[in-house]
Amino acid sequence: MALHDENVVWHSHPVTVAAREQLHGHRGVVLWFTGLSGSGKSTVAGALEEALHQRGVSTYLLDGDNVRYGLCRDLGFSDADRQENIRRVGEVASLMADAGLIVLTAFISPHRAERQLVKERVGHDRFIEIYVNTPLAICEQRDPKGLYKKARAGELRNFTGIDAIYEAPDSPQVHLNGEQLVTNLVSQLLDLLRRRDIIRS
């Protein structure tokens, strides 16, 4: 479909975002976790989602590996495919936030420009960039999927942090130390969500 196809018209709906948020009892936002492979993005995002669920908050977690089973199954790992992967995820996350959910996304998303595009699509007031900052050496020690080992051996090309660049956020809304306990990081994030009046409990 062309970007500006004259036959495609955006339809407004009688149920507004504000009405959906009122029903859920909290705001709809996107929590965008970014960091190297093995930094703890998925672990922290999953623990935060569990904590929010226990508090009656409506959530959904979009994980980098999981979306490639369906939504992005046709994409590889070239620069163009990675950009399209993040674009699709950003679109889905934006729709879910419109539905009043707190959407957690765990993606390396190595390029600032791509993260900025998602932020603009979602809306600056509904997008929270969370940088899980974990030293490369620690990520390599963890190496939960054995990817760093393959990259170091030359068996895996264009791997972020080894032979492909990761552009750390210049000024993320949240900067987490990935070497801290997950429980501490979740507490920090819950406090942030309360301070910003995103959740009440």
Curated annotation (Swiss-Prot):
Keyword ATP-binding (UniProt): yes
Biochemical pathway: Sulfur metabolism; hydrogen sulfide biosynthesis; sulfite from sulfate: step 2/3
Keywords, alphabetical: ATP-binding, Kinase, Nucleotide-binding, Phosphoprotein, Transferase
Enzyme class label: transferase
GO molecular function annotation: adenylylsulfate kinase activity; ATP binding
SUPFAM superfamilies noted in UniProt: P-loop containing nucleoside triphosphate hydrolases
InterPro entries found in the cross-reference section: APS_kinase, P-loop_NTPase
GO terms under biological process: hydrogen sulfide biosynthetic process; sulfate assimilation
Reactions performed catalytically: adenosine 5'-phosphosulfate + ATP = 3'-phosphoadenylyl sulfate + ADP + H(+)
List of residues binding ATP: G35, L36, S37, G38, S39, G40, K41, S42
EC assignment: 2.7.1.25
Active site, renumbered: S109
Family designation: Belongs to the APS kinase family.
Known function: Catalyzes the synthesis of activated sulfate.
The name this protein goes by in its record: Adenylyl-sulfate kinase
